[in-house]
Amino acid sequence: MHCPAKINYFFRWANYVKGVIANFHNIGPLEVGFDAAIVTSVPLGGGVSSSAALEVAFYTLLESLSNSLASDKKQKALACQKAEHDFAGNPCGIMDQFVSIFGDKGHAVFIDCMKMEAESVPLDDPNCAVLITNSNVKHDLATSAYAER
């Protein structure tokens, strides 16, 4: 892959965007320039897939700018995962990107990583509640044993 973008270690979040741009160019040309401001309410580093949310949102912006909205969702997830591997140095799995792309309101996402398939599962049982909490436990896949698997 040839990309003139340099990895930035001070503004680490920018590396995710650079990686998405680099991987999008592998799929189709982006023939317009643009300015973008990134604003989020997703807590960074809180274990709620903020990096995948950023990657998928930015990829979706590029699809819109290039009029290539018919992108394959699995290919989109893999491109975003590759961005995280190559530009952020984070050897992540595919779960976060799949959930960001295949998720639907009121549904869980069942992911078969062997087949690289996702399925929406309704969460319509009134006796079931989903609780999301911030444990304040920080993890860093780039420096953990995760990459050895």
Please place each PLM-identified region on the residue numbering:
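ATP-binding N-lobe of GHMP and related small-molecule kinases
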Residues: 1-52, 56-73, 78-87, 92, ...
